[in-house]
From Swiss-Prot:
It comes from Caenorhabditis elegans. InterPro entries: QTRTD1, Queuine_tRNA-ribosyltrfase, TGT-like_sf, tRNA_ribo_trans-like. This is Queuine tRNA-ribosyltransferase accessory subunit 2. Pfam families: TGT (PF01702). GO terms for biological process: tRNA-guanine transglycosylation. Zn(2+) binds at C320, C322, C325, H351. Belongs to the queuine tRNA-ribosyltransferase family. QTRT2 subfamily. It is found in: Cytoplasm. Non-catalytic subunit of the queuine tRNA-ribosyltransferase (TGT) that catalyzes the base-exchange of a guanine (G) residue with queuine (Q) at position 34 (anticodon wobble position) in tRNAs with GU(N) anticodons (tRNA-Asp, -Asn, -His and -Tyr), resulting in the hypermodified nucleoside queuosine (7-(((4,5-cis-dihydroxy-2-cyclopenten-1-yl)amino)methyl)-7-deazaguanosine). Binds 1 zinc ion per subunit. Its main location: cytoplasm. Keywords: Cytoplasm, Metal-binding, tRNA processing, Zinc.
Length: 373
């Protein structure tokens, strides 16, 4: 089971605790994040490096993304010991399985009444309910996500929006048919695009079913690099959550920057993922929070591709105790990026994930010191 409890509600968000995830005891404080995986690994890190150099505050809850593993689905099924063991993950890890990659492409126009499209290195895969159920049961993760028709951009027509919500409902009903076995705790996907009415309708249609451990909100149109409107996000989330039980875990997936994370925490989101720090690392960027975060939501992003750092032999960021900042300099990192060395991405992922982890610790501390409701 996913055992989650809210410990405190404030105007700035809610403090919670996840005691267990699946069969794994995690004692994980929220707001926090799932550790984003690609091909069953933290991008650019071996498990040995992750264990020895990536020092995070809490027990990992890993987010296993399907697109980089779907081509191995039959092999994993034949292997018979689950996806986590197949990928060499740490023993006893808490793992959540999602059909989508928060950093992957999801072009529109490819979903239909029987399946949603996911994109792999080899192209499009149409993921239907039967295939998804088989993958869920053979992968053996602690929790799973239901399918959602995500193809609801801002300019989507009313007819297509209605179809998207109806499909999301149908996918869920088919997945949990009475005579079908589905392993893993259920995290229900909530869609509806930019329509407040359809956000609420989708929540009512799929979010009030039995045996639900939590919810994940489809919000890819509001991630880093896209124009966002705080008022619009607030209204959509209010319509989504108002008809649902307030004590359930609330998740969201995608590369959200610190300012947006802080805003989403205020709207009651409990669990994010670490795709944002990975995205920055793969662009050759590192980020650092302002000294007064989260009183201020400001943060700095530094582009180490810039040749101005070539002769700079100071640490990446003063005061950061991560492996990267204590062992390497700006100039060396710029050299690694310039020569396209694999070590560059490793070092940037370590720093960015450490800073992202620190961000949530600061947010939790702020909530602890805030007046409760």
């Amino acid at each position: 089971m996913v055992k989650f409890q809210i410990e405190k509600k404030t105007l700035l968000g809610r403090l919670g605790k996840i005691d267990t995830w699946g069969s794994v005891e995690v004692n994980h404080q929220t707001p926090s994040f799932q550790t984003y995986l690609r091909a069953g690994h933290i991008p650019h890190l071996t498990w040995e490096v992750a264990e020895n150099q990536l020092k995070l505050e809490q027990t990992h809850i890993f987010q296993m993304t399907l697109p980089t593993l779907v081509s191995n689905a039959k092999i994993i099924e034949k292997f018979g010991k689950g996806a986590a063991k197949f990928c060499g993950m740490p023993a006893g890890a808490a793992v959540h399985l999602t059909p989508f990659d928060p950093l992957g492409k999801l072009p529109g126009g490819y979903n239909d009444s029987k399946s949603v499209a996911i994109w792999t290195a080899n192209g499009k895969v149409s993921l239907d309910v039967k295939m998804w159920r088989e993958i869920i049961n053979s992968f053996g993760c602690g929790s799973i996500e239901t399918l959602v028709d995500y193809d609801t951009p801002k300019d989507v027509g009313q007819k297509k929006l209605v179809k998207a919500v109806d499909r999301t409902k149908t996918f869920q009903e088919q997945l949990f048919q009475q005579d079908e076995k589905v392993n893993g705790e259920r995290i229900v996907s909530l869609g509806g695009g930019f329509s407040k009415y359809h956000r609420r309708k989708c929540a009512v249609d799929v979010g009030l079913a039995e045996n639900i451990a939590g919810y994940t909100v489809e919000f890819r149109e509001f991630t880093e690099g896209k124009e966002t409107d705080d008022k619009e996000m607030k209204e959509l989330l209010e319509e989504t959550f108002s008809p649902l039980p307030p004590t359930k875990l609330r998740c969201i997936s995608g590369p959200f920057n610190p300012k947006t994370v802080l805003f989403l925490v205020q709207q009651g989101i409990d669990l994010f993922d670490s795709s944002f720090p990975v995205k920055l690392a793969e662009e050759g960027h590192a980020f650092c929070l302002s000294d007064d975060f989260p009183t201020s939501s400001k943060y700095e992003v530094v582009d180490f591709n810039n040749e101005k750092f070539a002769d700079d032999f100071t640490a990446l960021f003063d005061g950061c105790a991560c492996y990267t900042c204590t062992k390497y300099t700006k100039g060396y990192l710029q050299h690694l990026l310039n020569t396209r060395e694999l070590l560059a991405s490793i070092l940037l992922v370590i720093h960015n994930m450490t800073e992202y982890d620190k961000m949530f610790k600061l947010i939790r501390s702020s909530l602890e010191n805030s007046e409760g409701l």
